[in-house]
């Protein structure tokens, strides 16, 4: 049990110190992510490699995104990862030995929450690619450069969130595994051996209750502080996720406004072309009529010249 609590404390301290540490480069993080090599981690590694290939947005990726092949591949990789993860979690649950019911329930709840977040990240990624395919189909031969830029930004953010939640799940499974290992190693003899020192410690604490009354309060305060730090970290992560979602929504609104402005410019150009098509024939017809009228007047004047006698002459 002490080993389990030690792992819990180390995990919480690592989470509290994470804000002050410099962010690792993506390549380094990738190498650290799946180092234990559990089956579910291997499956997630395949999903991760496929995602990195999709993120290149090469010509082949663009071609396959036009169909449902990419989303189908991601669905298969997602199902493989979740299946292996559930099997690994069930294996750990079977290995859990004598443990306080409250501790067991809390650990199971934390692992389930981390597992759900990872599954939601994968689902969001698949839905975003499906949305991109639909948007490309509605462009009707127009340029999709802006769509690709938006997709690249979203994939980068989703990939970062997926990595963070996967690492969080790894940490919680490590705590869960520590409890299972301790339960598997614990037997009746070990329990009896531990009960003796615990009873003796209880007697000593009872005898020294007056002198050491402040120690339990200090332990409780430290435990409460650890829980508060964990809660603050969780709230901070949720706030960052919400901020990223709001930024994505603002980018989508800006893109839609620019798209509508482009459509209005195109419609104005079309209307201008139509007006030009309507008035140019009228102007040309008026010019022809005016030219014909001038020619007729000139011809009439040439055919009927003014006689000289009609011009008055000066007397000598």
UniProtKB/Swiss-Prot annotation:
Residues 154-164 are annotated as: LDL and other lipoprotein receptors binding. It is found in: Secreted; Secreted, Extracellular space; Secreted, Extracellular space, Extracellular matrix; Extracellular vesicle. It comes from Peromyscus leucopus (White-footed mouse). APOE is an apolipoprotein, a protein associating with lipid particles, that mainly functions in lipoprotein-mediated lipid transport between organs via the plasma and interstitial fluids. APOE is a core component of plasma lipoproteins and is involved in their production, conversion and clearance. Apolipoproteins are amphipathic molecules that interact both with lipids of the lipoprotein particle core and the aqueous environment of the plasma. Homotetramer. May interact with ABCA1; functionally associated with ABCA1 in the biogenesis of HDLs. May interact with APP/A4 amyloid-beta peptide; the interaction is extremely stable in vitro but its physiological significance is unclear. May interact with MAPT. May interact with MAP2. In the cerebrospinal fluid, interacts with secreted SORL1. Interacts with PMEL; this allows the loading of PMEL luminal fragment on ILVs to induce fibril nucleation. Residues 262-316 are annotated as: Homooligomerization. This is Apolipoprotein E. One of its GO terms (biological process) is cholesterol efflux. The modification Methionine sulfoxide is found at residue 139. Sequence repeats lie at residues 76-97, 98-119, 120-141, 142-163, 164-185, 186-207, 208-229, 230-251. SUPFAM superfamilies: Apolipoprotein A-I. Its main location: secreted. PANTHER family: APOLIPOPROTEIN, APOLIPOPROTEIN E. GO terms for molecular function: cholesterol transfer activity; heparin binding; phosphatidylcholine-sterol O-acyltransferase activator activity; phospholipid binding. One of its GO terms (cellular component) is high-density lipoprotein particle. The keyword Cell cycle does not apply. Heparin binds at residues 158-161, 225-232. Belongs to the apolipoprotein A1/A4/E family. Disulfide bonds: none annotated. Residues 76-251 are annotated as: 8 X 22 AA approximate tandem repeats. The gene is Apoe. Gene3D superfamilies: Apolipoprotein. It comes from the Eukaryota.
